[in-house]
């Protein structure tokens, strides 16, 4: 009987203890923000997809269609970091658009013109935002 009473007392003591929950707080509420692409980042993603389709059409001997006018937004799209929209970028953007326009106007040398457009992308990305270079290189037609 003494053992039962002792057991009840021990269980009772442990069950009545309050457990405090520790909350980690830095004093500031953190607000989760979803990443939103800048206009330029979204445009470049679209250009990449468009160029993947053009590459496949060239490899299959199909026509490539007309110059995509939305490529011209490269001159006006807002950047993630507006300081990237400098003279160097403007020169490289012009070279890229010229290469693309030549691709769509000269159907005899599409492979060479397409690869020249890829070159223009890489030359710019070597100096600005180098992350996608390996991905861009996959566009080359061998």
Please report, for each region that a protein language model flagged, where it lies by residue.
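Sec-dependent signal peptide recognition
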Residues: 2-7
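Short, linear, compositionally biased motifs with a strong N-terminal bias
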Residues: 10-11
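C-terminal motif of bacterial Sec signal peptides marking the signal peptidase cleavage site
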Residues: 14-15
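Extracytoplasmic c-type cytochrome modules immediately beyond a signal peptide or single-pass transmembrane anchor
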Residues: 19-117, 133-142
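The canonical Cys-X-X-Cys-His
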Residues: 117-129
């Amino acid at each position: 009987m003494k053992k039962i009473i002792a057991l009840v007392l021990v269980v009772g003591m442990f069950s009545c203890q309050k457990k405090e929950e520790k909350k980690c707080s830095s004093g500031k509420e953190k607000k989760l923000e979803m990443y939103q692409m800048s206009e330029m980042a979204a445009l470049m993603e679209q250009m990449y997809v468009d160029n993947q389709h053009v590459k496949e059409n060239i490899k299959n001997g199909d026509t490539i269609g007309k110059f995509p006018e939305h490529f011209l937004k490269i001159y006006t799209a807002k950047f993630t970091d507006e300081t990237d929209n400098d003279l160097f970028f403007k020169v490289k953007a012009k070279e890229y658009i010229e290469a693309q326009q030549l691709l769509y106007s000269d159907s005899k040398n599409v492979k060479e013109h397409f690869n020249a457009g890829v070159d223009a992308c890489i030359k710019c990305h070597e100096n600005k935002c180098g992350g996608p270079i390996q991905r861009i290189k996959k566009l080359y037609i061998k």
